């Protein structure tokens, strides 16, 4: 799940908006480059990037990596977004989806629960949490059957 940039920041926000426009058109390689440039720009000393915009850039760059099946790199970006803005529920959800796909059910559950702590009305996280619980129980049942 990608997000649109915040409303602050003038020029830097415009750069982020350009990246988002590319993302929205499905131009993921171009969007990734623009998000990376924005992140680099924010890293410069004296930058006035807002935490919201920087976290959004990391989250959305993570989405481009997810679409390229670069799961571990995507998780790194989601984690960076979380570190910058711990109250941002979307990267918890996105990281949880990857952890779920990789079979890391306990870690996925933690991420989905955190996303829901931050936003109880986040329906995609509700559904993902329920599915993860079901699949974890099914995996445990299969493993128990193999033990007999």
From Swiss-Prot:
The keyword Repeat applies. This is Tetratricopeptide repeat protein 32. SUPFAM superfamilies: TPR-like. It holds the Pfam family TPR_2. Keywords: Repeat, TPR repeat. TPR repeats lie at residues 12-45, 55-88, 89-122. InterPro entries: TPR-like_helical_dom_sf, TPR_2, TPR_rpt. It comes from Mus musculus.
């Amino acid at each position: 799940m990608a997000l649109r940039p915040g409303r602050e920041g003038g020029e830097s926000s415009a750069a982020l908006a350009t990246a988002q426009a590319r993302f929205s058109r499905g131009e993921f390689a171009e969007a990734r480059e623009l998000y990376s440039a924005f992140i680099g720009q924010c890293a410069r000393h004296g930058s006035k990037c807002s935490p919201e915009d920087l976290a959004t850039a990391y989250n959305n760059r993570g989405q481009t990596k997810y679409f390229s099946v670069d799961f571990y790199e995507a998780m790194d970006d989601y984690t960076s977004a979380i570190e910058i803005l711990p109250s941002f529920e979307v990267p918890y959800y996105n990281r949880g989806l990857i952890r779920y796909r990789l079979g890391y059910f306990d870690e996925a559950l933690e991420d989905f629960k955190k996303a829901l702590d931050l936003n109880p009305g986040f329906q995609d996280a509700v559904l993902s949490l329920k599915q993860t619980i079901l699949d974890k129980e099914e995996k445990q049942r299969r493993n128990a059957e193999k033990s007999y």
